[in-house]
Amino acid sequence: MTAALPPSLDGLRVLDFSRLLPGPYCTWLLADQGAEVIRVENPRELAKQAKVFGWDKMDAEDQARQRGRDMLARGKKSLRLDLGDSDAQAVLKRLVARVDVVVEDYRPGVLAGLGLSYEDLSALNPALVYVSLTLCGQTGPLRDKPGHDPVALALSGVMSRTGEDPEAPGLPGTPAADVLTGSHAAFATLAAVMSARATGLGRHVDVAMTECAMTLTANLLSRYETPADAPPRGSRRADLGLWRCADGRWLCTTDMEPRYWATFCEVMGRPDFIPLQLDASRRDEIRETLQALFAEKPRAHWLALFAEAGTQFAPVNDVTEALAEEQFRTRGAVVDVTLPGGTRQPQLGPPVRLGGEPAPRPAALPGHDNAEILERLGLEQEEITALSG
């Protein structure tokens, strides 16, 4: 009988100062693989968030449920401390000596002003991996520039390639740069941890949203001599697309390989289109013809035909439909988490399968783990109470 695998990152200790999406996404990936992530939550930041999202008007029970829905805080411990308080800063420095990784997403220089820079903390723990996530990185003329996901997509050139309108840039409906940055940061964190464990020396990991977003242009840069040679964006291929069916529902096809394109054309009753796959002069005509055909039957009709033929296709699911997909449920990509009060809510499971992932634990309220963490440092109850506010 095979022994159960332990969580892949069991024993990795992370102190998480991050607040915006890229940092918490990075540490969520680590926590979901078993890392102990201690989320440092500043009362001032919490108050700002509560006001912006209206959480300050909720009663305690609703606040607990709302917090439990925060997927990116799932599986993390919460340490509520005022970063501006000198006693809290001293406690954090003691904690730094016991962790492997620090993650932060403040603008360059902010944590240095609190005595929590890489230089300050690596002096206490030479093997420390200190991960900084910012818009443009720790160096360069734009190092101090503020901005969120759309600014990163705009600066990186990605927005110029987004959307169906070739005359105007487009905004994606999801925070692509944020999530991509968090993923890159998680990879970089583990690379630096491997090095630290081999050498005993940590490092400052500098993650820029703009540079992570630029990786979305890798395919374009690999295919054309200059970016200007790339065709305009939008529906410029006949062999892939989004199609509206008779019932108003959408499906997607990606039959770019010749054998798939041939099968697709046969299914659509237009074998004459097979030799015209790459004929740019006929693409608009082919697309118009295909769209008219799709508009004759409901989506279920086309899904059944394509499934039988084995072509490349998918229904365009909304988020609710995606959460209910049997494929995702079977693999644990969607899990049900019990929130405070007993409500069950579907959330995303770990996006990769390593085996041994711990069961999902809903996000705890801010400060939930203060006593456990501070007692571990040897603080007395009076000190814990004073620091916890």
Where are these regions (language model features)?
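N-terminal helix-loop segment corresponding to the beta1-alpha1 unit
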Residues: 1-201, 225, 365, 370-389
